[in-house]
Each structure stands twice: as C-alpha cells, then as structure tokens.
Amino acid sequence: MSDALGWVFTTPVSPGDTIDWLPTVNSRNPPHNEDFSWGEVSYSDIVPCFARGTHILTPGGDVLVENLRVGSRVETLDHGPQTVRWIGSAKRSARGACAPVRIRAGALENDRDLWVSQQHRMVLRGAKAELMFGEHEVFVPAKSLVNDCSVRIIEGGAVEYFHILFDNHEIIYAEGAMAESLHLGKQSFDALSYASRQEIKMLFPELDRAGTQLPQTARQVLRNYEVQALLHAV
C-alpha cells in the first residue's frame, strides 16, 4: 500500500484561513520531503497570488492586476496573447504565511518592485539551470528566494491577493519578471473556496470527471534545496 497524505475539510476554506492539525500518515515512516513540516497550514501558502498593484503585461501594455477581467488578453511566454478565463481575489492580514514576498526591482529582471504570495512560482533561467536540471528555465517558489536583502517577506498591514487562470498553466510577465499563472494542481485547486471551485468547474467541466488528469506545470518545479543549490552554484 502506498503512503498517503491529505486534508479533509468539513467547512469551506478561504484565503488566509489557517488550520491547526495533527498528522495521520499511512506509513510506518514519516514522509521524506525537505519541504514537509507538521504544524499550521495556510491557504496562501498553497495558492499562488499577485498582490494588488502588480502590473501585468498585455498586448496593449501593462495593466494593473486588479483591472484585469475575464476575457482580458494577457501576454504569455509560450503561447503569445491568451484569454483570462477566471480571476479570484481576497484581502488578508499580511502576517505569517499570508505575508507577501517583496522582490526588489532588478532582482528578477523586474522593472519595479514585485509583490507575490510566498508560494508563487517565479522563473529562473540560464546555463546553470540547464546544466543542473536539464532545462533552461525552471520554476522556484518566491519564498525560496528570500535573502533578507533584495527578496524579503514583509509583514504588517493588509494585502489583497489576485490569481489569474488561463486554459493552460502559463508564464506571464509581472512587473517585467516571469511568473506563473494559477495552476490547477490538486493542492491549489482543493485550497480554493467552494464557490471558487464551482466557478472553475463550470469553465472546465472535465474537472468533475473521475480520473481526469490535472494539467502539468509549464516548467519543472524545483524544491527548496534544489533552489539553494542553483543559487549558490559557482
């Protein structure tokens, strides 16, 4: 029998909610995962989001993320202009796992400071990535880039997060940096509120079918220890 780990909620879970939980693992041994830890789980630590005020590149130029609408066209790295299928947002206290990551201008080829949720995956690219992981471009969670200098977690006040969904998982341009759109992986999809899941299922009815394969990520996703190895490679 294979190991299994998951969560079952008896009430809807919304962005910013936290859950204190005790683990039950179907195994004599704990999960071997560098990123795994017992304790508090937060929606915003699973679902990738852009903070209000983020400029997103469209065919007509930069548009604030809060001004995008279903039907808006957004530039993507792989497939050119793509249509926004769904947008979600939520206001939360900027503390703990809900506190945003601030990426200073220039740190990731971004023209201005970029604010994203901690698990939002950014693109790192170059010869080192290709040598170490076989791909010129890879995804890394924003929080794995934190260096207490150009990339920091900023606590205090409130933050409004937005997530953008396309037909496929895409790489888009946020403040000039390459970042992911919302990926309908099992964890991120299950972490959305019930109402949001129902809206998305209306757009993608195949998600209700048993055995449906969820879409792959647009690039390989690195674990934290892999990100650190890449960042410190000589």
Regions found by a protein language model. Name each.
Residues 1-51, 57-59, 63, 159-234:
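Sequence-level preference for short, compositionally simple segments enriched
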Residues 51-58, 75-196:
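Long beta-strand-rich cores associated with HINT superfamily self-processing modules
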Residues 63-65, 82:
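Short, isolated positions in well-ordered beta-strands
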Residues 66-73:
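Structural motif
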